[in-house]
Amino acid sequence: MSFLELAKKRYSVRNYKDRPVEKEKILQVLEAARNAPSACNYQPWHFIVIADDEEIKNKVAETYPRNWFRKAPVVIAACGDHSLSWKRADGKDHCDVDIAIAVDHMTLAAAELGLGTCWVCAFDAEKCHKVLN
């Protein structure tokens, strides 16, 4: 499939099948993020895959209280480290831009693999940080 076809195929999914995602597919999605461009190639991110630990999954779900989110078989938390990100001369920090590019690479890779994704930004970041730390 062409890139344009892939971009058209990807959409926000909020209804998931009740089955686990194969580890190989998760690794391919993460590899797409690793290959994403970032300012000066600093890659100021790390990703936490939440799939098998029901206790952590439930605590993370409390940071974004939507029923569909609780039903996702996998959640990948994209974490930025602003101390590692490139800063422009005027102080503009590119961490969030770099992470957005990496996450978009993941969503496109997932779509190519037949997996549905949905960006979630309106979660309680402080609470999520405490759960995942």
Write out the residue ranges for each language-model feature.
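N-terminal amphipathic, basic helical "cap/leader" segment at the start of enzyme domains
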Residues: 1-74, 79
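Small-aliphatic-rich amphipathic alpha-helix that forms the alpha element of a beta-alpha
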Residues: 33-34, 76, 90-131
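Domain-scale selection of a single, long terminal region
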Residues: 55, 71, 82-84, 102-108
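Glycine/charged-rich beta-loop-alpha catalytic/anionic-binding loops adjacent to active sites
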Residues: 57-58, 83-94
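Short, intrinsically disordered/low-complexity patches at protein termini
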Residues: 65-66, 82-83, 111
